[in-house]
Amino acid sequence: MTEAMIRNKPGMASVKDMPLLQDGPPPGGFAPVRYARRISNTGPSAMAMFLAVSGAFAWGMYQVGQGNKIRRALKEEKYAARRTILPILQAEEDERFVSEWKKYLEYEADVMKDVPGWKVGENVYNSGRWMPPATGELRPDVW
């Protein structure tokens, strides 16, 4: 769309022939602009907000406490189950250890049969107390 069609002046020779249109304020002027701080009088009071937040916090902490009780009970149940089966597991391990120890003593007797004065199964450290072997030779085959 051309300027000539917009202003209804076809065939203008110069821009100076165009009628002068200038933006200005509406008749009577613009409405006053309020630039002061606006503090609303509606909505909950500070005390109401404080009480609501405090109540929500208290309810949340109550829920955390209930969750802690449940988690503690589940943990105790797990430990009780482990304490219950521990003697059975220990008995199985002791049985396995004894059979492996017998095999170890037989192997030691076979290897050291030519050494004079060697006593099979005797502790070489002479500490006076029994300790399980720490060298790993009596570990299960899966290890």
UniProtKB/Swiss-Prot annotation:
Keywords: Electron transport, Membrane, Mitochondrion, Mitochondrion inner membrane, Respiratory chain, Transmembrane, Transmembrane helix, Transport. Disulfide bonds: none annotated. InterPro entries: GRIM-19 (IPR009346). It comes from the Eukaryota. It holds the Pfam family GRIM-19. GO terms for biological process: embryo development ending in seed dormancy; photorespiration. The chain crosses the membrane at residues 43-65. The keyword Mitochondrion applies. The keyword Membrane applies. Its main location: mitochondrion. It is found in: Mitochondrion inner membrane. Belongs to the complex I NDUFA13 subunit family. Accessory subunit of the mitochondrial membrane respiratory chain NADH dehydrogenase (Complex I), that is believed not to be involved in catalysis. Complex I functions in the transfer of electrons from NADH to the respiratory chain. The immediate electron acceptor for the enzyme is believed to be ubiquinone. This is NADH dehydrogenase [ubiquinone] 1 alpha subcomplex subunit 13-A. It comes from Arabidopsis thaliana. The gene is MEE4.
